[in-house]
Curated annotation (Swiss-Prot):
Localization of this protein: Nucleus; Cytoplasm
Stretches of the chain forming a coiled coil according to its record: 75-133
Location of the region described as Required for nuclear import in the Swiss-Prot/TrEMBL record: 1-45
MF annotations from Gene Ontology: RNA binding; single-stranded DNA binding; WW domain binding
Extent of Basic residues compositional bias: 28-37
Feature: compositional bias, Polar residues: 1-11
Residue(s) carrying Phosphoserine: 181, 237, 279, 283, 353, 361, 364, 600
Protein name: WW domain-binding protein 11
Region (Disordered): 1-37, 186-213, 236-552, 587-623
Chain positions with N6-acetyllysine modification: 13, 565
One of the protein's GO biological processes: mRNA processing
């Protein structure tokens, strides 16, 4: 900090002599009082209590790091207060560091303790705030200990305590058989509960298969084993074929609990089959076999111990034929509309019905005979069913396309689900057999070609029987009928399927004429106004041919729309403005030139004044007069030169 001159201010401005004298006097006074001021500052610091300063800072910290209550003061205010208190405490430390080192050491200890407390408060505050933002599900839990705990496990068998059972699993549908075999041993070998203690309650969920097995033994009823799963048992463990379902075998045998376990699954499957007969026949096709023939087959197998049957196809085919009778074409169609796969048997039924449709045979007994023949083939040969099932899908494509059109028609609610499925259908369904499939919508009412056979071939009736009704109401038939009808089917698709029903009743009376030839009926009105609009250009083009008529027409239209009179205030001056000055000056001398000018004035005044926008007819007249004037002007110039 350099010395400043007393003759100028800080900015360098010259000072008055009086101000210069005052500044010099103050400088001397400050130099004299510097020691005194330092002593005053030290005395003020000594008057302040460092412990009180620490307590004030602790209060600020508690206020700031309080997780329960928001601080009363603003964050910025808290920082400023702490900063001032901290600076004061540091000045006191520096003062006592020079004057009294002992007090300095004590103050240093207070500062360290304060810092530790502040760190603890900050850590606790952060932990609480973080815990509020963390979700309970995101907290990782510790792994379960692998070693068994000290809890007494008396009669509850642990599945994890029998690792060998994993290797002896005979089927994926049942629990390990080894676990079942160890169950009685656990009951005898494990010590019982003390007399004063009660066993724990059953675990949540359905009873385990072991309990079902024990209950079956006590009550005395025997559950049946499905034949298909019995075949699996024979494949995996031949001992079961020899022993069968003998309950006298010791409890350690591997087949002791397996039949009951599988029986429970069988009952579940039977209940499931009752539901899936209507919805998903493909996935549970095998379970259809076991529902009716289960008791019969199991009773026979109980009587004969050796009942290894690797080819149990007749039973399956019998049940499948039963299923074929149960699954009607209506159900197959509903399954197809629901987006589910149709069981192969249902498709075969459709195949038979379609063959009869194509032959147009009104005899329903032919269908029964064909089904009986199919039954006999399936009974005689097990592989015939597999081959027929493999051949059914390719042949069942036309039925889905041919039987589909009747569906949209029957109920008013039918069309909504039908359009999304039908658009791809008609093009593929019409080529193979237009007579059987499309006729309900395409044939006139006088051709009941298929309406007789359809109700008889398809027992349910309503879906196939309704097609005779739709022809009077075209909306249901519009989606599948674009190729034959042409224009009419293209109009409905933009509208939603629910709109067509009101058309016949409400909109038909006024719209009957245009609906038949829709495009020809709609377009003729448009050409009628067009000739009136397009007739103007020919008239305009023809107008220049007749100057008088064109001028008259232009004047009439111009007066109606645009008035060009204000454009020419002085006709003579405006017309002769572009004429050379020589012509204007010497106009009285040259009578020949004046006459054409007057003529041009008279001729061009009318078109310029009244028909300025349409200058077509007036152009030739003005051009001719100007040419005459120009020729006269050139002659005059030649005479002058």
């Amino acid at each position: 900090m350099g010395r400043r001159s007393t003759s100028s201010t800080k900015s360098g401005k010259f000072m008055n002599p009086t101000d210069q004298a005052r500044k010099e006097a103050r400088k001397r006074e400050l130099k004299k009082n510097k020691k005194q001021r330092m002593m005053v500052r030290a005395a003020v610091l000594k008057m302040k209590d460092p412990k009180q300063i620490i307590r004030d800072m602790e209060k600020l910290d508690e206020m700031e790091f309080n997780p329960v209550q928001q601080p009363q003061l603003n964050e910025k205010v808290l920082k400023d207060k702490r900063k001032k208190l901290r600076e004061t405490f540091e000045r006191i430390l520096r003062l006592y560091e020079k004057e009294n080192p002992d007090i300095y050491k004590e103050l240093r200890k207070l500062e360290v303790e304060y810092e530790q407390k502040r760190a603890q408060l900050s850590q606790y505050f952060d932990a609480v705030k973080n815990a509020q933002h963390v979700e309970v599900e995101s907290i990782p839990l510790p792994d379960m200990p692998h070693a068994p705990s000290n809890i007494l496990i008396q009669d509850i068998p642990l599945p994890g305590a029998q690792p060998p059972s994993i290797l002896k699993k005979t089927s994926a549908y049942g629990p390990p058989t080894r676990a079942v075999s160890i169950l009685p041993l656990l009951g005898h070998g494990v010590p019982r509960l003390p007399p004063g203690r009660k066993p724990p309650g059953p675990p949540p969920g359905p009873p385990p298969p072991q309990v079902v097995q024990m209950y079956g033994r006590k009550v005395g009823f025997a559950l049946d084993l499905p034949p298909r799963r019995r075949d699996e048992d024979m494949l995996y463990s031949p001992e079961l074929a020899q022993r069968g379902h003998d309950d006298d075998v010791s409890s350690t045998s591997e087949d002791d609990g397996y039949p009951e376990d599988m029986d429970q699954d069988k009952h579940d499957d039977s209940t499931d089959d009752s539901d899936t007969d209507k919805s998903d026949g493909e996935s549970d096709g095998d379970e259809f076999v076991h529902r009716d023939n289960g008791e019969r087959d199991n009773n026979e197998e109980k009587k004969s111990g050796l009942s290894v049957r690797f080819a149990d196809m007749p039973g399956k085919s019998r049940k499948k034929k039963k299923n074929m009778k149960e699954l009607t074409p209506l159900q197959a169609m509903m399954l197809r509309m629901a987006g589910q796969e149709i069981p192969e048997e249902g498709r075969e039924v459709e195949e038979f019905s379609e063959d009869d449709d194509e032959d147009d045979s009104d005899d329903s007994e032919a269908e029964k005979q064909s089904q009986k023949q199919h039954k006999e083939e399936s009974h005689s040969d097990g592989t015939s069913t597999a081959s027929s099932q493999q051949q059914a899908p390719p042949q069942s494509v036309p039925p889905s396309q041919i039987q589909a059109p009747p569906m949209p028609g029957p109920p008013p609610l039918g069309p909504p689900p039908a359009p999304p499925l039908r658009p791809p259908g008609p093009p593929t369904g019409l080529p193979p057999g237009p007579p059987p499939g499309a006729p309900p919508f395409l044939r006139p009412p006088g051709m009941p070609g298929l309406r007789g056979p359809l109700p008889r071939l398809l027992p349910p009736g309503p879906p196939p029987g309704r097609p005779p009704g739709p022809p009077p109401g075209p909306p249901p038939g519009l989606p599948p009928g674009p190729p034959p009808r042409g224009p009419p089917p293209r109009l409905p698709p933009p509208a939603p399927p629910g709109i067509p029903p009101p058309r016949p009743g409400m909109m038909r009376p006024p719209l009957v004429p245009p609906l038949g030839p829709a495009p020809p009926g709609l377009f003729p009105p448009a050409p009628l106004p067009n000739p009136g609009v397009l007739s103007a250009p020919p008239n305009l083009i023809q107008r220049p041919k007749a100057d008088d008529t064109s001028a008259a027409t232009i004047e009439k239209k111009a007066t109606a729309t645009i008035s060009a009179k204000p454009q020419i205030t002085n006709p003579k001056a405006e017309i002769t403005r572009f004429v050379p000055t020589a012509l204007r000056v010497r106009r009285e001398n040259k009578g020949a030139t004046a006459a054409p000018q007057r003529k041009s004035e008279d001729d061009s005044a009318v078109p310029l004044a009244k028909a300025a926008p349409k200058s077509g007819p007036s152009v030739p007249v003005s051009v001719q007069t100007k040419d005459d004037v120009y020729e006269a002007f050139m002659k005059e110039m030649e005479g002058l030169l």
